[in-house]
A protein has these predicted regions:
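Histone-fold recognition with a strong bias for associated Lys/Arg-rich disordered tails
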Residues: 1-148
């Protein structure tokens, strides 16, 4: 694969694992990826969310509630946190998003777009859409912020 992940995406993945550990999850899912993204308040994605008048504290609380509900039925059975199938799929979609945007490096905005573009029901997408964040809107805002 010619695309590679930016250092920021690697940082987000580390944050996501920390969030999964903090919330006693069995694996890292899309919700943890989004928690990792919004943890970096200075990121381009958080700036876009602010421009869209989105309160990231509300998104964080909704994601945490969703993860906690899932954890009641799925007790922690491992100490090795890995990406679950949905999160792995989002990373693959992020690579495709980067290609569509004609960039070689997968960055944080590609993760956000991948979450929103994912055809499966993932908790991150559900929370984003319930807060009126759509793929088309996010893409438009990201294009506005990337222009000089």
């Amino acid at each position: 694969m010619t695309s590679q992940f930016s250092p920021k995406v690697s940082e987000i993945l580390a944050y996501s694992r920390e969030e999964a550990t903090r919330l006693a999850s069995r694996s890292v899912g899309p919700e943890h990826l989004l928690l990792g993204i919004i943890r970096d308040r200075k990121s381009n994605v958080c700036d876009v969310l602010r421009r869209m008048a989105i309160n990231t504290d509300i998104i964080k609380a909704e994601l945490e509630d969703r993860v906690r509900e899932d954890n009641y039925s799925q007790p922690l059975i491992t100490t090795e946190l890995v990406l679950n199938d949905k999160a792995s799929n989002i990373l693959k979609l992020a690579v495709l998003e980067a290609r569509v945007q004609h960039t070689q490096t997968v960055d944080v905005e590609h993760l956000l777009l991948a979450m929103l573009h994912d055809k499966s029901d993932n908790g991150a997408k559900i929370v984003l859409e319930s807060n009126n964040i759509t793929y088309d809107d996010a893409l438009a805002y990201l294009h506005k912020t990337s222009k000089p």
